[in-house]
Regions:
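Short beta-alpha junctions and helix-cap segments that line functional grooves
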Residues: 112-116
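Amphipathic alpha-helical coiled-coil/rod segments that serve as protein-protein coupling scaffolds
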Residues: 1-111, 124-128
Length: 130
């Protein structure tokens, strides 16, 4: 049936990559909180001429970099989740699975030319009579 799992790829490295991406995102979010607080403090201090305009501008620029790091971290988490989802190889159509070309525990690569198996669609069946 369509959506039925045909193969399972070891998810361990993909889980590790997802956990790493989540940790990087958490670090970036914590840094952004710190930078937001620093900019808020400097905004008051620059108005009172207690801190230089250059220091304030640097803090604002660093805040922008921290926000970009958070966005990049979110994208990395999304990518890791997508890659983890690819560890379940499912049938795209309903049909019969042909002979499997790989055995359990075999090493396969994303770029290999050999098919792992073929799914043959049985419904509808078209016949050409001549």
């Amino acid at each position: 049936k369509a959506g039925q799992r045909l193969y399972k790829i070891d998810p361990a490295p993909y889980i590790a990559a997802l956990n790493s991406a989540k940790a990087t995102l958490a670090k970036a979010q914590a840094n952004l909180v710190t930078q937001n607080a620093l900019v808020a403090r400097y905004k008051v201090l620059v108005a009172a001429n207690a801190v230089s305009k250059q220091d304030y501008d640097n803090a604002v620029a660093t805040q922008g970099q921290a926000a970009a790091d958070v966005a990049a971290g979110k994208a990395a988490v999304d990518t890791a989740q997508i890659n983890l989802g690819y560890t379940d190889v499912v049938s795209p159509i309903t049909g019969r699975v042909g002979i499997s070309q790989v055995t359990p525990g075999a090493y396969v690569q994303a770029s290999q030319a050999t098919l792992m198996s073929t799914v043959q669609q049985l419904d509808p069946v078209y016949v050409d009579l001549t």
